Regions:
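Bacterial N-terminal signal peptides
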Residues: 9-18
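Serine-dependent protease modules
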Residues: 24-258
Length: 259
């Protein structure tokens, strides 16, 4: 009996000694990247819907394609920002939330020049909003994360760095982006409109384009520029001259839209 009690005490001692090591091992898995994604994931939505695209050639005709992209919730009432090219021409916009529920959404306003748009998600329940960082103090070489609906695979996470700042990019004769963030975080079709995050899980940009034929050259619109455009899109006098009576202001956990 004495020996048995001694073995039990010894086993208990070693278990208590090993426990902090196990806890530390678990903490090592929960890296800053993991925490950043956990912080931001629920505020990122998948956008999809059918659109008609005009073919070229003698027998040109409109063909139906499945559009896809990503959006970021900036107000708990369901206002989200995305790229205009994601929702341009989509007749019925649908949004899949982080919970897996799919709901309808509508285009509120857009700015074709900057390729930004605001949509309103049809929901009664408040939605999680993204935490906003700033693009005023970005550092070349700092770690960033891209989160989005890459090739239809929802909430795909890729990691990279800020490769350069203040890039001007011409993607077509009629579309020029200015003052972009360049990153080597993988940005694929479907990522458009999704957030570029810093290591704290704060949105520092909206992913918008990749360099065709290149690897590791993607671009994002700086968040400070995004907020300026969104404020204008949701102001009383709209770019498209539509009255909504909404004013956007930044706050600690997102952009609150006041009526």
């Amino acid at each position: 009996m004495v020996y048995t009690r001694g073995y039990l005490l010894l086993a208990t001692f070693f278990a208590l000694v090993a426990l902090p090591g196990l806890v530390r091992a678990e903490d090592l898995r929960r890296t800053a990247i993991v925490r950043a994604i956990q912080t931001s994931r629920d505020s990122v939505v998948n956008i999809h819907g059918e659109k008609f695209v005009s073919d070229t050639g003698d027998d040109a005709e409109d063909r139906r394609v499945n559009g896809m992209g990503t959006g970021v919730v900036i107000d708990p009432r369901g206002y989200a920002v995305t790229n205009f090219h994601v929702v341009d021409g989509v007749r019925e916009i649908e949004v899949t939330l982080a919970s897996g529920r799919t709901v309808a959404a509508r285009l509120i306003s857009h700015d074709r020049r900057t390729d930004l748009a605001v949509i309103k998600i049809d929901t009664v329940d408040p939605l999680p909003v993204i935490q906003l960082g700033t693009s005023d103090d970005l550092l070349t070489g700092e770690t960033v994360l891209a989160l989005g609906n890459a090739f239809g695979y929802e909430h795909t996470v890729t990691r990279g760095i800020i490769s350069a700042l203040h890039r001007n990019v011409d993607v077509s004769p009629t579309q020029r982006y200015e003052d972009l963030i360049q990153t080597d975080a993988s940005i694929n079709p479907g990522n458009s409109g999704g957030p570029l995050l810093n290591i704290n899980g704060e949105m520092i940009g909206i992913n918008v384009a990749v360099r065709a034929g290149a690897q590791g050259i993607g671009f994002a619109i700086p968040v400070d520029s995004v907020l300026r455009i969104v404020t204008r899109l949701l102001s009383i006098e709209r770019i498209d001259h539509t009255w909504h009576g909404l004013v956007c202001r930044t706050c600690g956990t997102g952009a609150m839209i006041e009526t």
